[in-house]
């Protein structure tokens, strides 16, 4: 978080936090309630978000759920939805933290290579994350959707 980064930087230079760093921390703290509210709304609506995003993805990419597709059959479709749920959870972590560090450290590094080795169409996973953004945006206020949208975009971009 901005708090940890500011402290680590100041300590590395054996100095007190600067006025600018303190202002950034104050802004981070004051926006905390908003970030927590957004994360709570996404958490409370996670099943709806994942299901509707999956429906949108499978409608847009029927090849994924057709015979021979990576999400063909009930078990593989459930695996695909599980992955979307995982990315939604990571997104809520990023929102709460106010940056993408938890997303990077917990679940994005190495993902592209893993999906390639499994033969999973990475663009379909990224499209699923974008579909979750669309569903979440319909649940959130415009301001909250803009805040959360950056995290969905980050994950989709990291997968693409």
Swiss-Prot record:
Membrane topology, as annotated, equals: Peripheral membrane protein
In which broad location class does this protein mainly occur, judging by the first location in its UniProt entry? membrane
N4-methylasparagine PTM positions read 70
Q: Tell me the compartments it is located in.
A: Cellular thylakoid membrane
How does it get modified after it is made?
Answer: Contains one covalently linked phycocyanobilin chromophore.
Return the CDD domains for the record: APC_alpha (cd12125)
Q: What is the protein's known function?
A: Light-harvesting photosynthetic bile pigment-protein from the phycobiliprotein complex. Allophycocyanin has a maximum absorption at approximately 650 nanometers.
The entry assigns this protein to a family as follows:
Belongs to the phycobiliprotein family.
Q: What is this protein called?
A: Allophycocyanin alpha chain
Q: Which organism is it from?
A: Mastigocladus laminosus (Fischerella sp.)
């Amino acid at each position: 978080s901005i708090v940890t980064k500011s402290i680590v930087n100041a300590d590395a230079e054996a100095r007190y936090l600067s006025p600018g760093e303190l202002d950034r921390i104050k802004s981070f703290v004051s926006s905390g309630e908003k970030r927590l509210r957004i994360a709570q709304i996404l958490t409370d609506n996670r099943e709806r978000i994942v299901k509707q995003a999956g429906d949108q993805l499978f409608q847009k990419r029927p090849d994924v759920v057709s015979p021979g597709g990576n999400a063909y059959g009930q078990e593989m479709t459930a695996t695909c939805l599980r992955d979307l749920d995982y990315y939604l959870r990571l997104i809520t972590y990023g929102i709460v933290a106010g940056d993408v560090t938890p997303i990077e450290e917990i679940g994005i590094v190495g993902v592209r290579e893993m999906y390639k080795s499994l033969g999973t169409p990475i663009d379909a996973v990224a499209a699923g994350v974008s579909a979750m953004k669309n569903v979440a945006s319909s649940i959130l206020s415009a301001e909250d959707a803009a805040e959360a949208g950056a995290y969905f975009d980050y994950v989709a971009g990291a997968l693409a």
